[in-house]
Regions:
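Beta-strand-rich, non-transmembrane domain signature
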Residues: 3-188
Length: 188
């Protein structure tokens, strides 16, 4: 009955979590997510990439799980390295509308491995005392659920043209077997 209820009320995340707990359904995003991001940061920092903006993207990951009952869950991981003074200016304030998101990480990983949390306020993450060699780590999840005639339809776009040079960009879709896609590629 819970699954049937979700079919008619897909925005009820509490009910979905209850169903997944009862049926022991794993979080599919967590199954493919990078497990130890701090290890990856340590391995990738000091990349040889150059940037006029003073920032290199070490990880740009966007994973979306199309839920069988309708709607979707998304997870974003962004990891930036500051490589010169321009990067400090670029990244000291990061605009992110956290209203509809669950912010999981927003921190600076210093060169010595210490972690400094960002300050949050009105759609802005503030990274104080940035220095060259610091890495900014941002991670958040969001749900996009609705009801009505088009509740199973969605438009999703992802870009691979970041302002900053990127070491790794990941765009992944997890979907039920019966999902059909209509795709368009522009300027590709």
């Amino acid at each position: 009955y819970i699954r049937q209820s979700l079919t008619h009320n897909s925005e009820n995340n509490q009910l979905r979590n209850q169903l997944y707990d009862i049926t022991k359904t794993p979080d599919e995003i967590e199954e493919i997510d990078i497990k130890d991001k701090y290890k990856v940061i340590k391995e990738r920092r000091n990349s040889k990439l150059k940037s006029d903006y003073g920032v290199v993207t070490l990880i740009d990951q966007y994973v979306v799980n199309i839920l069988p009952e309708g709607g979707r869950k998304s997870k974003v991981v962004l990891v930036y390295e500051i490589i010169d003074e321009n990067g400090i200016e670029q990244m000291k304030e990061y605009q992110l509308n956290t209203y509809s998101l669950t912010l999981q990480k927003s921190e600076i990983v210093k060169a010595d491995g210490s972690i400094v949390p960002a300050e949050e306020g009105s759609g802005t993450l503030v990274f104080s005392n940035l220095a060259i060699g610091d890495v900014i780590y941002i991670e958040y999840e969001s749900y996009s659920n609705s009801t009505g005639r088009f509740y199973k339809d969605f438009n999703l776009d992802c870009y691979f043209n970041s302002t900053y040079p990127t070491v790794e960009a990941v765009f992944a879709i997890i979907n039920p077997e019966n999902v059909n896609y209509s795709t368009k590629l522009f300027n590709g």
